[in-house]
């Protein structure tokens, strides 16, 4: 049996774009041969793709770093470098992807074949053929490739099941799943026999089918992490119907009604929306002594909490071991599923905007100026830094082009307003140059 893993942290890095090339044609009567350097190729993106054959995130336990290949450099004769292929990473259905730094949900992957770009590849740098003008017919300018996006991600698997079984340990959830489906969960006469979620397909006598999940037993304080706690509570979030299994034999000395109230409090504390899901009470172990008496007492206690009799939850007395009452329970569950819509885990406000990593937002601040301890002026800002990394510092014309870009952004004027004088050191990252007023 493969190990079950439902959380993982990974780092992804898209490929860098290939550098543009400075090259010239070797033809008579063409100044300097004419520009002939091609563009660099696009860097590969990192893409998550849903594979319905996967059931766990175990593949990410030892392989946590994923890096796509960079694009090829531009070539002579105006030929572009080859773009790199995207890196496709398979994930199971029900995988939620978060940005580890911001905690923002990037996507919720639930459909087989669904894809999402988690790190976008960098654009290839332009070759010098792109910079030819009537005033400069033979430019010695080419751009470096754009860096690929790099991210730290948190993956969380919430299994896809129509029906979730909840209840205290040893109330018979695993036994119930084993007799109504082909699932083979571990069953034992001790607490927390089930330590991972088990999923089984159920088929009713009328031909309806649905997926049922047996979740590890809950105890008081589970929503705060007591016992197996929130480690597996997440898996009930995708279910549409909850089967609340209760041991009506009270064989372990617990009160069935107190168990019912305690579990519902844990569900509500973990996620208020869990209580919006329709719930069927499964009174299990009815073949045991005193179970009928306990059930009658349970019904009376439950009814006392409701003013409207029609709002009372449905109760189905069963015995998983004796195979009693199962058909009617499954038929009622199928009927309830048929009239219950899916519950949306994340709305548009929860999901991070899917925007190009290097796209300039209208409100994006172009640059910032600060003063270092050594009195150097330090320039920073996403837009400015992107322009810098794409500047080929080995070419004088490229450096001059970058200087013009800084001037156009208002950097020179801003430095003067801050008090910069001729000869002052200006720093971008580790690169330094003198301010010329």
UniProtKB/Swiss-Prot annotation:
Q: Specify the OBG-type G domain's residue ranges.
A: 161-338
MF GO annotations = GTP binding; GTPase activity; magnesium ion binding
Query: Which InterPro entries does the record cross-reference, listed alphabetically?
Result: G_OBG, GTP-bd, GTP-bd_Obg/CgtA, GTP-bd_prot_GTP1/OBG_C_sf, GTP1-OBG_CS, GTP1_OBG_dom, GTP1_OBG_dom_sf, OBG_GTPase
Q: Name one GO cellular component term.
A: cytoplasm
| The protein's Enzyme Commission number | 3.6.5.-
- Cellular localisation: Cytoplasm
- Family matches, as SUPFAM superfamilies: Obg GTP-binding protein C-terminal domain, Obg GTP-binding protein N-terminal domain, P-loop containing nucleoside triphosphate hydrolases
Q: Which Gene3D superfamilies does UniProt cross-reference here?
A: GTP-binding protein OBG, C-terminal domain, GTP1/OBG domain, P-loop containing nucleotide triphosphate hydrolases
Obg domain ranges (all copies): 2-160
Q: Which cofactor does it need?
A: Mg(2+)
**Sequence ranges assigned to domain OCT in this UniProt record:** 359-437
**Enzyme class, UniProt record, top EC level:** hydrolase
Binding residues annotated for Mg(2+), in chain numbering: 174, 194
**Gene Ontology biological process terms in this record:** ribosome biogenesis
Keywords, A to Z, come to: Cytoplasm, GTP-binding, Hydrolase, Magnesium, Metal-binding, Nucleotide-binding
Q: Which domain of life is it from?
A: Bacteria
List residues binding GTP: 167-174, 192-196, 214-217, 284-287, 319-321
Assembly and interaction partners: Monomer.
Family designation: Belongs to the TRAFAC class OBG-HflX-like GTPase superfamily. OBG GTPase family.
- Main function: An essential GTPase which binds GTP, GDP and possibly (p)ppGpp with moderate affinity, with high nucleotide exchange rates and a fairly low GTP hydrolysis rate. Plays a role in control of the cell cycle, stress response, ribosome biogenesis and in those bacteria that undergo differentiation, in morphogenesis control.
Protein name per its UniProtKB record:
GTPase Obg
Organism, per UniProt?
A: Streptococcus equi subsp. equi (strain 4047)
UniProt lists the gene as obg
């Amino acid at each position: 049996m493969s190990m079950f893993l439902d959380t993982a942290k990974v780092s992804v890095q898209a490929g860098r774009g290939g550098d543009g090339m400075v090259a010239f044609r070797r033809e008579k009567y063409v100044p300097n041969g004419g520009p002939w350097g091609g563009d660099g190729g696009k860097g590969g993106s990192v893409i998550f793709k849903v594979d319905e054959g996967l059931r766990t995130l175990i593949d990410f336990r030892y392989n946590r770093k994923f890096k796509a290949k960079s694009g090829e450099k531009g070539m002579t004769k105006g030929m572009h470098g080859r773009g790199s292929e995207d890196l496709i990473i398979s994930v199971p259905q029900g995988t939620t992807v978060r940005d580890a730094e911001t905690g923002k949900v990037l996507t919720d992957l639930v459909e087989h074949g669904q894809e999402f770009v988690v790190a976008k590849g960098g654009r290839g740098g332009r070759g010098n053929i792109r910079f030819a003008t009537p005033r400069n017919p033979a430019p010695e300018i080419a751009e470096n490739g754009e860096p690929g996006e790099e991210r730290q991600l948190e993956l969380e698997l919430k299994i896809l099941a129509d029906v979730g079984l909840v209840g205290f340990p040893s109330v018979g959830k695993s036994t119930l799943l084993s007799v109504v489906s082909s699932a083979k969960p571990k069953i034992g006469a001790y607490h927390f026999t089930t330590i991972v979620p088990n999923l089984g397909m159920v088929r009713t006598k009328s031909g309806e089918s649905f997926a049922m999940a047996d979740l590890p037993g809950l105890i008081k304080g589970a929503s705060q992490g007591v016992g197996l706690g929130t480690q597996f509570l997440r898996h009930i979030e995708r279910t549409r119907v909850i089967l609340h299994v209760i041991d009506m034999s009270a064989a372990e000395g617990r009160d069935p009604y107190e168990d019912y109230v305690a579990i519902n409090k844990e569900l509500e504390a973990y996620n208020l929306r869990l209580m919006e899901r329709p719930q069927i009470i499964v009174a299990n172990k009815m073949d045991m002594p005193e179970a009928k008496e306990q059930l009658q007492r349970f019904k009376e206690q439950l009814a006392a909490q409701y003013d409207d009799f029609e709002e009372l939850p449905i109760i189905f007395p069963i015995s998983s071991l004796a195979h009693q009452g199962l058909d009617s329970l499954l038929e009622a569950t199928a009927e309830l599923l048929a009239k219950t819509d899916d519950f949306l885990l994340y709305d548009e406000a929860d999901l991070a905007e899917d925007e190009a990593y290097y796209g300039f937002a209208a409100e994006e601040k172009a640059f910032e100026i600060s003063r270092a301890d050594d009195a150097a002026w330090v320039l920073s800002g996403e837009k400015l830094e992107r322009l810098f990394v794409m500047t080929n510092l080995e070419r004088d014309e490229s450096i001059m082009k970058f200087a013009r870009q800084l001037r156009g952004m208002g950097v020179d004027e801003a430095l003067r307003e801050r008090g910069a004088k001729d000869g002052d050191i200006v720093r971008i990252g580790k690169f330094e140059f003198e301010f010329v007023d």
